[in-house]
Amino acid sequence: MDVRTAALAAVLGLGAAGATVDRSRAELPGWLAGCWELRQGARHAMEMWMPPEGGMMLGASRTTKDGQLHEFEQLRLQLAGDTLVYTALPSGQPEAAFRSVEVTETSFTVANPAHDFPQRIGYRRQGADSLIAWIEGPGKDGVKRIEYPMRRMDCRR
């Protein structure tokens, strides 16, 4: 921050307490590494992420219902310059890439407005052992949002 900008910030009361954090440089969300699960009735979803290495995190998810495979997905998080890119290859569908629109120390949101559904995907850490993953896009009556509250689990299960 140059002297003129710092002086203006001080006059306007935008000191350290009100400073914004520079989000132009995305980082891989290392806090996502490990295994996560969601259990809702007969439905069980599990998502696994490798720790960041070589500028990439690899992930996979599997959802079963009544013990039968319902869907699976291969996932990739990588940096493209200063942008976090989330690439998903869902079972039976073409690969889709989403680019970061917001990245913080505890969350990230990626978007692809040209994709049918979802058009936005987000993850928000809630403490050491839980997170909310969500997808969002056009629905019958406006924006449709689905949230997936997940808890950390032992990867060996």
Report each predicted region and the residues it spans.
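Bacterial Sec-dependent signal peptides at the C-terminal "C-region" and cleavage site
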Residues: 8-26
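Well-ordered alpha/beta subsegment
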Residues: 106-112, 116-125, 132-136
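Beta-rich carbohydrate-recognition and catalytic domains
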Residues: 21-28, 33, 146-155
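Edge beta-strand at a domain terminus
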Residues: 95, 100, 105, 130-157
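Central antiparallel beta-sheet cores of small beta-barrel/beta-sandwich binding domains
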Residues: 23, 33, 38-114
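Bacterial N-terminal signal peptides that target proteins for export
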Residues: 1-7
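Conserved strand-loop elements at the edges of beta-sheets that form or border functional pockets
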Residues: 30, 51, 125
